[in-house]
């Protein structure tokens, strides 16, 4: 299939045994990247997944936490270098809320060489979106929305896939009812699950404003979605994560539950 979800990382901020959560939606030869994890590990993940820099023309930054933003700096750098080498055609647009893209551009200007930043405002565009704004990525139509974070401002999005299915990314914090009209009935719901409910005392998700696989399953059932994909997890239980998380979510949700590993590709359409 030419429409797929490529999970580059599946872990939370502090993981060391997998990479921070970030992914690309592939539409043919086009790749829409969401976040970049916490460093240049994104480059190896992209290489291993066969994602060419020349195929990325849109990036979505959900928020400015370190495990999401710093990998994007590296992708911006490498794409600019590809432009300079004549190996990248067209424009790169980095979407996000106004504060997010401003912080990202500031970091890039402070840390990247002039031959990279010379592209800013020309063929590398930091593009702020408002809550409810439409955007285009990899030939697909998207809708950005404020997830209602109580920590750093964060945006998620709904994306219409080539076959008309809807994919909704809720970011990495618990669902807010303000976005029910967007999330309800989604074909694919991407949702954070910091740990199992059974391990809540150990990992303390609620104190960190995160949720569990149990919570995600109840949410998916309540919203009537078809497929639930869990990410942004702890990495102490990687060996049993897929089966255990899926089972806990499935105790409430009768649809399909996916708990991918880093590098896994999920066929969407």
Per-segment meaning from a language model:
Residues 1-49, 153-171, 188:
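Conserved beta-strand hairpin/beta-sheet module of binuclear metal-dependent hydrolase folds
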Residues 5, 35, 46, 63, ...:
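Divalent metal-coordination and catalytic microenvironments
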Residues 15-17, 128-198:
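Active-site-proximal loop/helix segment associated with metal-binding centers of metalloenzymes
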Residues 33-37, 57-64, 97, 167-173, ...:
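Active-site neighborhood of phospho(di)ester-bond hydrolases with catalytic His/Asp-centered motifs
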Residues 40-92:
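Active-site metal-binding motif and surrounding structural segment of the metallo-beta-lactamase
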Residues 66, 94, 100-101, 233-238:
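Short histidine/acidic/glycine/proline-rich micro-motifs that form metal-
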Residues 88-153, 250, 258, 262:
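Metallo-beta-lactamase
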Residues 174-263:
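Cap/insert and terminal regions of metallo-dependent hydrolase folds
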């Amino acid at each position: 299939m030419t429409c797929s979800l490529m999970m580059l990382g599946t872990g939370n901020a502090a993981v060391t045994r997998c990479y921070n959560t970030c992914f690309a939606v592939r539409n043919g030869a086009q790749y829409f990247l969401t976040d970049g994890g916490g460093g240049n590990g994104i480059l190896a993940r992209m290489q291993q997944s066969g994602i060419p820099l020349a195929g990325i023309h849109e990036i979505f930054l959900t928020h400015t936490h370190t495990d999401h933003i710093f990998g994007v700096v590296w992708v911006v750098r490498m794409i600019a270098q590809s432009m300079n080498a004549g190996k990248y055609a067209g424009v790169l647009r980095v979407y996000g809320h106004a504060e997010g893209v401003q912080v990202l551009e500031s970091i890039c200007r402070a840390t990247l060489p002039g031959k990279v930043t010379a592209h800013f405002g020309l063929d590398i565009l930091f593009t702020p979106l408002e809550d409810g704004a439409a955007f285009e990525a990899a030939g697909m139509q998207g809708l950005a929305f404020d997830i209602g974070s109580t920590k750093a401002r964060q945006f998620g999005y709904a994306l219409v896939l080539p076959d008309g299915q809807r994919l909704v990314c809720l970011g990495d914090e618990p669902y807010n009812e303000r976005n029910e009209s967007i999330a309800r009935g989604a074909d694919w719901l991407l949702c954070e699950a910091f740990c199992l409910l059974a391990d809540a005392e150990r990992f303390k998700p609620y104190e960190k404003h995160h949720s569990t696989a149990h919570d995600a399953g109840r949410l998916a059932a309540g919203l009537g979605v078809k497929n639930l994909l869990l990410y942004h997890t702890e990495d102490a239980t990687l060996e049993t994560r897929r089966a255990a998380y899926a089972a806990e979510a499935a105790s409430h949700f009768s649809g399909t539950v996916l708990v991918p590993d880093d590098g896994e590709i999920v066929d969407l359409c």
